[in-house]
């Protein structure tokens, strides 16, 4: 895992109990309830720590998720749309987060803008099924990916801030 701040943030996310995916209609409702409670707690903790960095919502079934994530670099906010589907084998298989507008801009991304979490995150997820959920995906997957990739993409000139795009 990462630094002390990440460890602390993750330790404050409630662990999930229900081992169910979208195929199991009745238990899936219970799993979704746990997912939402963990996400709400994680977002509340982030806001308290002045580290608010994403918004996430789902379709009615809880199988398609979308929202925005952002990264502050040199006091400029870089904001991106994100999306992912819950795999039918969830929670055994972690979702693959896509940031479509960054597609093709980094080697740490698959076709369609799906971020690469294979080396570091997926083994951690596999060891923690079914306790890890979407809040853990954000904290241990997307958050660290943004922290590494966005400054690199900015330094290479592959992404620019909205205010700098017009000039």
Curated annotation (Swiss-Prot):
The keyword Heme does not apply. CDD domains: UBCc_UFC1. One of its GO terms (biological process) is protein K69-linked ufmylation. InterPro entries: UBQ-conjugating_enzyme/RWD (IPR016135), Ufc1 (IPR014806). GO terms for molecular function: UFM1 conjugating enzyme activity. The keyword Ribonucleoprotein does not apply. The active site is at residue 116. It comes from the Eukaryota. GO terms for cellular component: cytoplasm. Keywords: Ubl conjugation pathway. Interacts with UBA5 (via C-terminus). Interacts with UFL1. Interacts with UFM1. Belongs to the ubiquitin-conjugating enzyme family. UFC1 subfamily. E2-like enzyme which specifically catalyzes the second step in ufmylation. Accepts the ubiquitin-like modifier UFM1 from the E1 enzyme UBA5 and forms an intermediate with UFM1 via a thioester linkage. Ufmylation is involved in various processes, such as ribosome recycling, response to DNA damage, interferon response or reticulophagy (also called ER-phagy). This is Ubiquitin-fold modifier-conjugating enzyme 1. It comes from Salmo salar. The gene is ufc1.
